[in-house]
Design a protein with these regions (language model features):
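N-terminal loops that bind phosphate or other acidic moieties
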Residues: 1-199
Length: 199
């Protein structure tokens, strides 16, 4: 914790960092790989939680409120239409492709997603936030993030893949198999992080 505080103080160029006001920006999107049975619940949960965040009623929002933190949910790729009631609409597409069959999304859309993150950080800075936390919501995200981590670190998929939100042992085996096959089939270029993200 001390190391983090020192880094924040360095970024702010002051001996005692200011971390108020603070905001959490939660990027919400669906993953097509859910079709492979790699999660315990359905894709529709992403939209439900996104809507609840927009109303300030999700568990995350309640925890953030107790810390005096504002929450900005961003629909960057939820598989269904989410009303703009408290949700920032930056939808790039309605969910990604199923990485078991195809790359997750075109390179240009991966770049747009990164640019959206930059836009949200700039928005928060313009509003005067001193600390911005980024987060994600999307059923299947631990599958795609494990795939990205395996490629970028060179670590075995099996050492990076977990049960997510309570996957069974058989489901976990299926999840690892899907990730390993996706990496082998799409051959992401480790020297090009955007290629890794998009595949």
């Amino acid at each position: 914790l001390q190391e983090i505080i020192v880094r924040i103080a360095g970024m702010q160029r002051q001996p005692v960092p200011e971390i108020k006001p603070r905001a959490a920006v939660i990027f919400c999107a669906d993953n097509g790989v859910v079709a492979e049975g790699v999660t315990q619940c359905g894709q529709d949960v992403t939209a439900t939680v996104t809507r609840n965040m927009g109303k300030g009623k999700s568990t995350m929002c309640l925890m953030a409120k107790s810390l005096g933190m504002d929450v900005y949910p961003v629909d960057i790729g939820v598989a269904e239409t989410v009303d703009k009631n408290g949700v920032i609409d930056r939808k790039i597409r309605f969910g990604t492709e199923n990485i078991a069959d195809n790359p997750a999304l075109p390179r240009a859309q991966a770049i747009t997603a990164i640019e959206t993150g930059i836009e949200m950080a700039e928005m928060c800075a313009a509003k005067g936030y001193r600390l911005i936390c980024g987060g994600e919501m999307g059923i299947g995200n631990t599958t795609t993030s494990a795939a990205v981590a395996a490629v970028l670190t060179g670590e075995p998929v099996r050492s990076l893949t977990g049960r997510g939100a309570g996957l069974s042992s058989a489901g976990l085996q299926r999840k690892m198999q899907v990730i390993e096959c996706a990496i082998a089939n799409h051959a992401p270029d480790i020297s090009d992080p955007i290629d890794v993200i998009s595949k």
